[in-house]
């Protein structure tokens, strides 16, 4: 049963209110809380003994959405979930994932999700994933999420991936890999906020394997208090391709940030670029907002929201 806390989590991580007409699978506390398929999108339980689901999207499916959020509302729960996506040729679909934890006690709650995408030819896929954690007042249980995502993009297809870590995740280790065929494109936007003593490590690999393949990574992060972030994006060009990695971070308090982008060209026709910048909030930006009547804290919050938008 979905209670008030569950509903608030679903709204935060998937912008989900009520029951949509789209394909849907809500996983709650390691069980299936709700599921519905559509004429063109089928969601089924795995048959190989692993926890998770298979999502099959028929060729030619356009304008449809698929919601697959995960919520945890217990303390001490740990799970490993495997979701496989099979997306046919000539599709145009949105997939909305995400995980929210409401930890009610002092034990660690943890979700490890392994997603594998098989995208056919000439398709467009928009994938959105938000992570959020919170605790009952006075409780200290850790909230941990470790997503692994591997995407195989067929010829002429495009994937746009938007990942957001909103707040409240004590530890996360992310691994993301894209294998791009000729004429395909991937655009990744990663937004990350850490605070307190939180730690976040993100490894990303984009393999541009065919002529005309393109890959772009835009990473924006804010590290506050005593938190730690490490971002290691790698772009490998094996053909006449284009890759661009841009990492921008704001550091505050006693936080630490390590950004180590890498590019590898295995073809004379590969064009690869990487950029990385880490800095604090400029004093003149704060002053400008403070002269408009904002407090120092309000000015900081306004700048950070704009940076992570």
Where are the language model's segments positioned?
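Sequence-level preference for short, compositionally simple segments enriched
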Residues: 1, 288, 297-298
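C-terminal functional modules
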Residues: 1-26, 30
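Conserved beta-strand/loop scaffold segments within soluble protein domains that form the structured core
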Residues: 25-28, 33-294, 304-309
């Amino acid at each position: 049963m979905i209670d008030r806390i569950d509903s608030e989590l679903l709204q935060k991580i998937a912008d989900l209110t009520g029951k949509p007409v789209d394909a849907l699978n809500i996983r709650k506390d390691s069980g299936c809380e709700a599921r519905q398929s559509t004429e063109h999108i089928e969601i089924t339980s795995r048959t190989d003994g692993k926890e998770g689901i298979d999502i099959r999207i028929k060729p030619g499916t356009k304008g449809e959405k698929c919601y697959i959020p995960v919520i945890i509302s217990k303390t001490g729960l740990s799970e490993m979930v495997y979701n496989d996506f099979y997306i046919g040729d000539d599709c145009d679909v949105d997939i909305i994932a995400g995980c929210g934890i409401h930890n009610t006690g002092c034990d660690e709650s943890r979700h490890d999700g392994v997603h594998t995408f098989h995208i056919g030819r000439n398709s467009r896929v928009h994938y959105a994933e938000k992570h959020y954690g919170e605790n009952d007042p006075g409780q200290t249980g850790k909230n941990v999420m470790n997503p692994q995502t591997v995407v195989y993009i067929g010829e002429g297809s495009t994937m746009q991936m938007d990942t957001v870590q909103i707040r409240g995740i004590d530890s996360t280790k992310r691994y993301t890999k894209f294998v791009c065929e000729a004429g395909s494109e991937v655009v990744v936007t990663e937004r990350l906020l850490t605070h307190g003593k939180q730690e976040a490590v993100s490894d990303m690999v984009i393999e541009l394997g065919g002529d005309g393949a393109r890959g772009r990574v835009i990473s924006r992060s804010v590290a506050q208090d005593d938190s730690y972030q490490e971002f290691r994006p790698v772009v490998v060009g094996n053909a006449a391709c284009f890759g661009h990695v841009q990492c921008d971070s704001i550091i505050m308090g006693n936080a630490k940030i390590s950004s180590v982008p890498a590019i590898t060209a295995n073809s004379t026709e590969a064009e690869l670029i990487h950029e990385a910048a880490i800095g604090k909030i400029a004093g003149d930006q704060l002053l400008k907002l403070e002269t408009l009547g904002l407090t120092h804290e309000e000015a900081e919050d306004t700048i950070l929201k704009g940076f992570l938008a």
